[in-house]
From Swiss-Prot:
Protein's recorded name: Matrix protein
Protein location: Virion; Host cytoplasm
Organism: Infectious hematopoietic necrosis virus (strain Oregon69) (IHNV)
Quaternary context: Homomultimer.
Main location: virion
Name of the encoding gene: M
Keywords: Host cytoplasm, Viral matrix protein, Virion
A Pfam cross-reference name: Rhabdo_matrix
Length: 195
């Protein structure tokens, strides 16, 4: 496990096999971007949580990942209280409503003089669920206390760089993480009278 303590090495979102059961210590320090829901808009709290869980699982590779809970909460909170824009996408064959939520969370944490966008490239993640496609475009900054670092300095979160390195491939092969996670969450039941 010394590969996670190298100096001048970016520790990114850890793969699912690095679970240590310390979900409470995982913190999203900063996040910015937008969530686009194309199709059925989530209206109830249950639907917003359902959409958030699917999107978070698609980003971190499963619901067992240490940062799954905090990411789900962040997305659900933005869908519930964040600013919203709704428009119709006329560029498709079947025009579907497109709802956009602005994700913005920040604390007074300064790594260096460089702003967040210079450190972490924009990533796009997309997942399809019942009647909708959810896409997040943005960047995250996580605390490093859950990835085996010596100190609590923040590390960059993303899915490039580390996942393409030889060290990651060796660890991935050793832990046999080639199997894809097939995640299914129960869709919330519709309430009301059927016509």
């Amino acid at each position: 496990m010394s590969i996670f303590k190298r100096a001048k090495r970016t520790v990114l979102i850890p793969p699912p096999h690095l679970l240590s059961g310390d979900e409470e210590r995982v913190t999203i320090l900063s996040a910015e971007g937008e969530i686009k829901v194309t199709g059925r808009r989530p209206t109830t709290l249950e639907e917003k949580i359902y959409y958030s869980m699917n999107l978070a699982a698609a980003i971190v590779g499963g619901d067992l990942h240490p940062s799954f809970k905090s990411m789900t909460y962040l997305f659900q909170k933005e869908m519930e209280f964040g600013s919203t824009q709704e428009k119709v996408n006329f560029g498709s064959r079947k025009p579907a409503p497109q709802t956009t939520y602005q994700v913005m969370k920040a604390r007074e944490i300064y790594l260096q003089t460089q702003p967040l966008e210079k450190k972490i490239p924009m990533q796009t993640y997309s997942v399809s669920t019942e009647g909708a496609t959810i896409t997040f475009t943005g960047r995250f900054l996580f605390s490093s206390s859950h990835v085996g670092c010596d100190d609590n300095r923040t590390k960059l979160a993303g899915l490039d760089g580390f996942t393409t390195s030889n060290s990651y491939q060796r660890v991935k092969d050793y832990y046999a993480q080639e199997t894809a996670l097939a995640l299914t969450f129960a869709a919330p039941e519709k309430r009301g009278k059927e016509k």
